[in-house]
């Protein structure tokens, strides 16, 4: 297969990536681009790629962070072998880093790279397993809302599993998960990697008021300040701030389309599954559904507020008693399993928060 080496720059760093044209016997099934982010976990990546392989998207963007040390190389090479088992007609772009950047800024870098080459794209991490309907769902709605500035992203993960009371296949919300999502270049081009809105007092005051009025996470602005001070772009806070500053809405499927299988001992963001509070464990065991097409589209673009209430309760935003209860539950579970290191870590974090010393890194 022909391969072309290209070079692209990110904030003064130059990285080589390749563009491969796969001409196999099976045709592409869905005309959409998919970005896959992975590192060194072949077992979970295999499950994600199996679904991508069934869906057969027309374009693939493959981003892999580089090794921290020699011990990472076995997993890194195993992951590369998995994602290169492509047996359908597909244009494949690869960006494999030579050094380790970590989740941040890798998330930001990979997505800016993919959206510089595609005007709309699906994003999947190596622990996010989609249903087959997810690809068709995203394709149809990426086209439908391509030029609608009110819509910021299309989500795949529904924290309700199935949202009651909605007579359509999706609805609109101002809260969302990044466990499987899609968006447009028009949105990514607005991402403010330098957090310049923090230099505008009126914008900061507006965001402060919105966070209070919506009972959003109270530490959001401090998180943005910490991320700016760290001098590297953090995708999640950049995405959320862009959505808030633009009064954007997300498309949410009425039925969940994603499984997250990332709650393992070696995961970056989550503690061991068995020591999670019960409600959070449920997020990792939800059923994913297949939709019936054609989709039933809502007539009006208006936020469905009951979902926001469910979402806030799931993450204990604006629910201090629920948060305290979960902290106690987590402490008891860690005691039960003898996870004293996690207990010390959690206590240290809470003490730092009480003293105003906690920083988001």
Where are these regions (language model features)?
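Peripheral/terminal regions associated with large enzymatic or DNA-binding modules
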Residues: 22-123, 128-361
